[in-house]
Amino acid sequence: MIELGVNIDHVATLRQARRTWEPDPTWAAVEAHLGGADGITVHLREDRRHIQDDDVRRLRELTQIKLNLEMAATDEMVGIARSIKPEMAMLVPEGRHEVTTEGGLDIVSQEARLKDVIARLADAGIVTSVFIDAEIAQIDAAARIGARVCEIHTGPYAHAFHAQGRDAESPAVLAEIDKIRRAGEAICSHGMRFNAGHALNYYNVQPIARLPGIRELHIGHAIVSRAVFSGIREAVAEMKRLMREAAAG
């Protein structure tokens, strides 16, 4: 059955706006779990703009569902991951001037370095995921470096969906869906796990959730935005219902 990993970074964004102690991302993780989340995702950025080191430690200690740590492939982050031991570490590109992750990781240009990073994480018992664009060359490279999971960047699909007035049958949207579908087939052919995420929301999630072979979606901003009005538990539960409805056909 398809799973939902809830990204709670923007709960921390709200807290950091006042440099105070609330809202607490750990409590958001608990509420997300109660709403049906299968995992919690946080991005410990090098500039610590939202999630802090202590947040990750507390989440590791207190949450009862799997923890996915998004991270740059740096020595500092590898050391933190090896110490905290999340169930999964997702390698992402990172730029200090970006508002959010703007594209997939370019594995092809840095295979040797990323292979070493994955080996160091695996040595600590951590499954490694890579966040990549829906490109066959990147998927093949992910398999070569030993990634266990590929998360396909759904931003281009989400942007097309919005630009086309939420028309899931428009040629532009169908082209993006087909690109992700073909990427998923390639991922599965390598024996890797097919995940997806980025800019998914309550309007565009179902065409992605019904793709063959897809295992998990990571969604954050849309859920936190909805939770401002409806509460995290209800927001997560509604997203999970939409995904399951789509996956069931």
UniProtKB/Swiss-Prot annotation:
<comment type="function">
    <text>Catalyzes the complicated ring closure reaction between the two acyclic compounds 1-deoxy-D-xylulose-5-phosphate (DXP) and 3-amino-2-oxopropyl phosphate (1-amino-acetone-3-phosphate or AAP) to form pyridoxine 5'-phosphate (PNP) and inorganic phosphate.</text>
</comment>
<feature type="active site" description="Proton acceptor">
    <location>
        <position position="70"/>
    </location>
</feature>
<feature type="binding site">
    <location>
        <position position="7"/>
    </location>
    <ligand>
        <name>3-amino-2-oxopropyl phosphate</name>
    </ligand>
</feature>
<comment type="subunit">
    <text>Homooctamer; tetramer of dimers.</text>
</comment>
<comment type="pathway">
    <text>Cofactor biosynthesis; pyridoxine 5'-phosphate biosynthesis; pyridoxine 5'-phosphate from D-erythrose 4-phosphate: step 5/5.</text>
</comment>
<dbReference type="GO" id="GO:0033856">
    <property type="term" value="F:pyridoxine 5'-phosphate synthase activity"/>
</dbReference>
<dbReference type="Pfam" id="PF03740">
    <property type="entry name" value="PdxJ"/>
</dbReference>
<comment type="similarity">
    <text>Belongs to the PNP synthase family.</text>
</comment>
<dbReference type="InterPro" id="IPR004569">
    <property type="entry name" value="PyrdxlP_synth_PdxJ"/>
</dbReference>
<keyword id="KW-0808">Transferase</keyword>
<feature type="binding site">
    <location>
        <begin position="220"/>
        <end position="221"/>
    </location>
    <ligand>
        <name>3-amino-2-oxopropyl phosphate</name>
    </ligand>
</feature>
<feature type="binding site">
    <location>
        <position position="100"/>
    </location>
    <ligand>
        <name>1-deoxy-D-xylulose 5-phosphate</name>
    </ligand>
</feature>
<dbReference type="InterPro" id="IPR036130">
    <property type="entry name" value="Pyridoxine-5'_phos_synth"/>
</dbReference>
<dbReference type="GO" id="GO:0008615">
    <property type="term" value="P:pyridoxine biosynthetic process"/>
</dbReference>
<protein>
    <recommendedName>
        <fullName>Pyridoxine 5'-phosphate synthase</fullName>
        <ecNumber>2.6.99.2</ecNumber>
    </recommendedName>
</protein>
<dbReference type="InterPro" id="IPR013785">
    <property type="entry name" value="Aldolase_TIM"/>
</dbReference>
<feature type="binding site">
    <location>
        <position position="50"/>
    </location>
    <ligand>
        <name>1-deoxy-D-xylulose 5-phosphate</name>
    </ligand>
</feature>
<feature type="binding site">
    <location>
        <position position="18"/>
    </location>
    <ligand>
        <name>3-amino-2-oxopropyl phosphate</name>
    </ligand>
</feature>
<dbReference type="GO" id="GO:0005829">
    <property type="term" value="C:cytosol"/>
</dbReference>
<feature type="binding site">
    <location>
        <position position="199"/>
    </location>
    <ligand>
        <name>3-amino-2-oxopropyl phosphate</name>
    </ligand>
</feature>
<feature type="active site" description="Proton acceptor">
    <location>
        <position position="43"/>
    </location>
</feature>
<feature type="binding site">
    <location>
        <position position="45"/>
    </location>
    <ligand>
        <name>1-deoxy-D-xylulose 5-phosphate</name>
    </ligand>
</feature>
<feature type="active site" description="Proton donor">
    <location>
        <position position="198"/>
    </location>
</feature>
<keyword id="KW-0963">Cytoplasm</keyword>
<feature type="binding site">
    <location>
        <begin position="9"/>
        <end position="10"/>
    </location>
    <ligand>
        <name>1-deoxy-D-xylulose 5-phosphate</name>
    </ligand>
</feature>
<feature type="site" description="Transition state stabilizer">
    <location>
        <position position="151"/>
    </location>
</feature>
<keyword id="KW-0664">Pyridoxine biosynthesis</keyword>
